[in-house]
Swiss-Prot record:
Protein name per UniProt: Photosystem II reaction center protein H
Entry PTM: Phosphorylation is a light-dependent reaction catalyzed by a membrane-bound kinase; phosphorylation occurs on Thr residue(s) in the N-terminus of the protein.
Subunit structure: PSII is composed of 1 copy each of membrane proteins PsbA, PsbB, PsbC, PsbD, PsbE, PsbF, PsbH, PsbI, PsbJ, PsbK, PsbL, PsbM, PsbT, PsbX, PsbY, PsbZ, Psb30/Ycf12, at least 3 peripheral proteins of the oxygen-evolving complex and a large number of cofactors. It forms dimeric complexes.
Originating organism: Chlorella vulgaris (Green alga)
Taxonomic classification: Eukaryota, Viridiplantae, Chlorophyta, core chlorophytes, Trebouxiophyceae
Phosphothreonine: residues bearing it: 6
NCBIfam families named among the record's database cross-references: PRK02624.1
A single cellular component GO annotation: chloroplast thylakoid membrane
Gene: psbH
Pfam family, one: PsbH
Location, primary (coarse class): plastid
Thylakoid recorded as keyword: yes
Length: 80
């Protein structure tokens, strides 16, 4: 039968309680619950947009699209 069990181990005997697990237990107390509404979705979108702007700035510096004084992007300058 697919629902039968083969071991005599109790569920409570399978885990070990550690100080770290006890410390982190409150973080898992809301498991499975979903906040109503949009929650922090807008905040996440703002941070994603800021991160995208950051990546574009880094790409432009790397491609020398943005000229900065005393900033060179070459392997020779890194070896000095």
């Amino acid at each position: 039968m697919a629902t039968g069990t083969t071991s005599k181990v109790k569920v409570s005997d399978t885990g070990v309680s550690t100080p770290l697990g006890t410390l982190l237990k409150p973080l898992n107390s809301e498991y499975g619950k979903v906040a109503p509404g949009w929650g922090t979705t807008v905040l996440m979108g703002i941070f994603m947009a800021l991160f995208a702007v950051f990546l574009v700035i880094i790409l432009e510096i790397y491609n020398s699209s943005v000229l900065l004084d005393d900033v060179t992007m070459s392997w020779e300058s890194l070896s000095k």
